[in-house]
């Protein structure tokens, strides 16, 4: 089984590195600058779960080759170009596993490929590149979840399970992947929304009554949109999402807030813009969500 990992950053570099560490056939599709960096230093992972350092197999857009599994771990705003880049590497039986936040990317992938080729996927990990291009895994979690949309343990799922077996990461085959995706989407959109709106970590926000109320209102607005879309986002899910938020570190910053602090492009359109589009189409009022998105739009316009 030949793997193509699109992106060698905090997520793609990590899971691709773990697959390679086990002895799987893994190639990374990267841009020229990242390729030059990797050729010079190798792919390096610093993690309490075990460090990794090796010279990875690399390929660039425009080259030829066929791969059985394509793992997409790029930023959502790059997906249009990623789709064009990977098309030549995909054969009829290839399977695509995206590890992106949100849901909009599935609509793009289903339109570009057959839905049967795209598995549902998500991950829970805090990892990022330093200025030398080395990956630092800084969370206890390094969980990667994927599965068939109908929950079946198909032949290809069993083959993937074998390939991931023994990898130094928590890999879960889900029988309800769509539910898992929406659950994470709710939490990520709320966490990123509230921290970017107030430009603070979670702790100081949730330490105030007004901050807690705003966070709960945002979660409620997102759940209302999801319910109207047919997603089972009941009050128990709202409570669980807020409870998870309150259990996190006082100094916890969303990755989107860190992107803003570093002057980088955010996934605001992909996460919050997508929800706003649905709210408008459904004639739903979502004032906090709209304020979150307006703040992100102003940031993108000014950076």
Swiss-Prot record:
InterPro entries: 6-PGluconate_DH-like_C_sf, 6PGD_dom2, ApbA, KPA_reductase, KPR-Related, KPR_N, NAD(P)-bd_dom_sf. Coiled coil: none annotated. The active site is at residue 184. One of its GO terms (molecular function) is 2-dehydropantoate 2-reductase activity. Keywords: NADP, Oxidoreductase. GO terms for biological process: pantothenate biosynthetic process. NADP(+) binds at residues 7-12, 101, 267. Transmembrane segments: none annotated. The keyword Cell wall biogenesis/degradation does not apply. Its EC number is 1.1.1.-. One of its GO terms (cellular component) is cytoplasm. The keyword Transferase does not apply. It comes from the Bacteria. Belongs to the ketopantoate reductase family. This is Uncharacterized oxidoreductase YkpB. It comes from Bacillus subtilis (strain 168). The gene is ykpB.
